[in-house]
Swiss-Prot record:
Family listed: Belongs to the glyoxalase I family.
EC number: 4.4.1.5
Protein known as: Lactoylglutathione lyase
Cofactor note: Binds 1 nickel or zinc ion per subunit.
Cofactor(s) for this UniProt protein: Ni(2+); Zn(2+)
Quaternary context: Monomer.
Binding site for substrate: R31, N97, R116, H120
Pathway membership, UniProt: Secondary metabolite metabolism; methylglyoxal degradation; (R)-lactate from methylglyoxal: step 1/2
Catalytic activity, reaction form: (R)-S-lactoylglutathione = methylglyoxal + glutathione
Species of the source: Pseudomonas putida
Parts forming coiled coils: none
Length: 173
C-alpha cells in the first residue's frame, strides 16, 4: 500500500499538527517478576545497556531503563543522563515490584493469550540468521523460529516473563 493510500485510511490524520513535529516515542514499560533474570536477558542476550535505575523504597518497586545505544554516548553525569534518556527513542523501562521474584505462583500476563492485549516489542538486527543461531546457543526460548510458518524472515523469542520479542533485519534475507 502506498504512503498516499495509507494516509487516506479512516482515522488517519495525514497532516499532523505542527505542534507534534518534535514528539519522539521515548519508551515502553514492561512489568517483570525477577529483575535479575530480566536484566540478564536484555543486557546479555539482546545487548541493551542499563542507563538508569530509580528506586521507590516506600512503594516497594524499582524502575530500570535500558537502551540499545553505544555506551560512549551515555552521559556519566546523573542529571545529564536523565535529560539525555528523555530525548532518545526506544528506551525499555522494566518495572520490578519487590518480592514478586520470591512468589512461585506470581506471573504477569504477556498479552498473547486470552485475554489478548499487549503483543510484543521488536529488535532489529543486522543478520537475523546469525542472531537466531546465537539465541539457540544461549538456549533462549523461541515463540517462532525463522523456519516456522511462511514468514521466514522474522523470529520471536521470549523473555523470562514470556513477553515476545520480534527479531527482524532491515534488509531482505
Amino acid at each position: 500500500m502506498s504512503l498516499n493510500d495509507l494516509n487516506t485510511l479512516p482515522g488517519v490524520t495525514a497532516q499532523a499538527d505542527p505542534a507534534t513535529a518534535q514528539f519522539v516515542f521515548n519508551h515502553t514499560m514492561l512489568r517483570v517478576k525477577d529483575i535479575e533474570k530480566s536484566l540478564d536477558f536484555y543486557t546479555r542476550v539482546l545487548g541493551f545497556k542499563l542507563v538508569d535505575k530509580r528506586d521507590f523504597v516506600e512503594a516497594k518497586f524499582s524502575l530500570y531503563f535500558l537502551a540499545l545505544v553505544d555506551p560512549a554516548t551515555i552521559p556519566a553525569d546523573d542529571d545529564a543522563r536523565h535529560q539525555w534518556m528523555k530525548s532518545i527513542p526506544g528506551v525499555l523501562e522494566l518495572t520490578h515490584n519487590h518480592g514478586t521474584e520470591r512468589d512461585a505462583d506470581f506471573a504477569y500476563h504477556h498479552g498473547n493469550t486470552d485475554p489478548r492485549g499487549f503483543g510484543h516489542i521488536c529488535v532489529s538486527v543486522p543478520d537475523v540468521v546469525a542472531a537466531c543461531e546465537r539465541f539457540e546457543a544461549l538456549q533462549v526460548p523461541f515463540q517462532k523460529r525463522l523456519s516456522d510458518g511462511r514468514m521466514n524472515h522474522l523470529a520471536f523469542i521470549k523473555d523470562p516473563d514470556g513477553y515476545w520479542v520480534e527479531v527482524i533485519q532491515p534488509t531482505p534475507l
